[in-house]
């Protein structure tokens, strides 16, 4: 069975390099696409799903924003199994920080030019205080197109979704983007 995998916002698949997949799975990593100017989330999801063969059963695995994406793809091309890592199952699990972005619509009004290489480096530096075990953050963060980053943050803040019972959620107990206190994951990873 094929397992389609989508990593986190702006990340390539090095971020998932420690995962070991069963040999019976044919793992297919899907790269992020750059959104077109003014593109709706639904249209973007359709374009991401175009790369997938749904003529036979398949699974979906998404990390962080990739977890949101695979749940949306499942509406278009239903999967046998869906696993999300470090992600949320519904908009009810958004952190307060993300909810503030949703309510105020601040992400929509942020200028694109704040999503620069320097701001990515600053984020990486600050994140090390919260996640000292992850010194390779900038190695993973390879999609740095300012429009893509701004668009993605807007879509995360705007995302509305009712929980899908077939989604298996795995969260770290110290996740800073999607804190565990707002979710009831199926599995918890310590540290």
Predicted regions and their residues:
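Active-site catalytic motif of lipid deacylating hydrolases and related acyltransferases
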Residues: 1-56, 90, 106-112
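Active-site signature of alpha/beta-hydrolase-fold catalytic machinery across serine-
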Residues: 18, 72-73
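Short glycine-rich catalytic loops that host catalytic nucleophiles or stabilize transition states
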Residues: 30-32, 171, 182-191
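Gly/Ala-rich beta-loop-alpha elbow adjacent to hydrolase catalytic centers
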Residues: 61-70
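Flexible "cap/lid" loop of the alpha/beta hydrolase fold
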Residues: 78-113, 149
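Hydrophobic, aromatic-rich cap/lid helix
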Residues: 131-164
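Short beta-strand/loop motif that positions the catalytic acidic residue
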Residues: 169-171, 175
